[in-house]
């Protein structure tokens, strides 16, 4: 199975009417259908937001830095793959599908060890059918980039 780096971007709204940018990964059917990545892990970070609910410049830089580090650590041996991320309403969401939540947690702690504590919330759930991913894919339309 080859992991590509093809994504789409779409715009949505949260429950409060804030704009949310949705970035979804494409070409993941082999991974989804393999049955190996059954645990959906959602990481949420409430960031410093501007008047539109989007990250301030400094928060945006920090989010980008952390996102790349986490993604590299998780995807190096396909322990987990990031399937999508959402930005808006003062919160960044990263969605991963993983083989095991225990090892995911250990790696996440290793990646974040050099940093001060981040206000992260993490939720894990068995999602063998990748329902969240398929819901996110439904947001891709002719206006997506």
Model segments located where?
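Residues at beta-strand starts and edge strands
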Residues: 37-41, 90-92, 118
């Amino acid at each position: 199975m080859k992991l590509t780096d093809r994504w789409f971007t779409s715009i949505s709204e949260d429950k409060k009417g804030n704009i949310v940018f949705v970035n979804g990964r494409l070409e993941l059917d082999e991974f989804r259908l393999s049955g190996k990545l059954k645990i959906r892990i959602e990481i949420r970070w409430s960031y410093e937001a501007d008047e539109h609910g989007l990250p301030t410049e400094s928060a945006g830089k920090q989010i980008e830095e952390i996102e790349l580090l986490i993604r590299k650590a998780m995807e190096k041996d396909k322990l987990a793959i990031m399937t999508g991320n959402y930005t808006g309403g003062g919160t960044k969401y990263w969605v991963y599908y993983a083989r095991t939540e225990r090892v995911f947690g250990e790696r996440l702690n290793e990646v974040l060890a050099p940093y001060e504590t981040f206000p992260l919330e993490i939720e894990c759930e068995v999602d063998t059918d990748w329902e969240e991913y398929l819901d996110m894919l439904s947001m891709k339309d002719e206006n997506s980039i």
